[in-house]
Amino acid sequence: MPEGTTVTRLLPNICTDKMEETRDFYKELLGFVVGFEHKGWYIQMALPDKPELQLGIMRLDHEFTPRPFQHPAQGVIISVQVEDVEATYATVKARGFELAHDLCDEEFGMRRFMVADPNGLLVNMFSFP
């Protein structure tokens, strides 16, 4: 780590024009709950039993983000390690989520599948046996 830099938190924020759909997606998929909302442009979510696992949702056109960078998010894969990927896969399918990539085994030992959020960002659900 660079001298003088001590990372104390990492909080990814999804910039979107689909605030409610994105919030509902992560609530339904992962069980995240809203911990903080600010004036309709920012939602911070976390897992109730692991509040350090957080995700932010930010209105795409809000002044917080400099105008030249106000573009829909792309090229990001959100990877989420779960205890039992088979059980998670069954639950996700039963709830009607559309799969972007079916359950598979990778040569390096990961078992995974993917769904796409309302913004087209991929969520890679995985575990290691």
Regions found by a protein language model. Name each.
Residues 16-18:
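Conserved beta-strand-loop-alpha-helix junction that forms the acyl-donor binding cleft
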Residues 122-125:
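Short glycine-/small-residue motifs
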Residues 1-11, 33-83, 89-116, 127-129:
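Vicinal oxygen chelate
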Residues 22-27, 92, 120:
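Conserved active-site tyrosine of GNAT-family acetyltransferases
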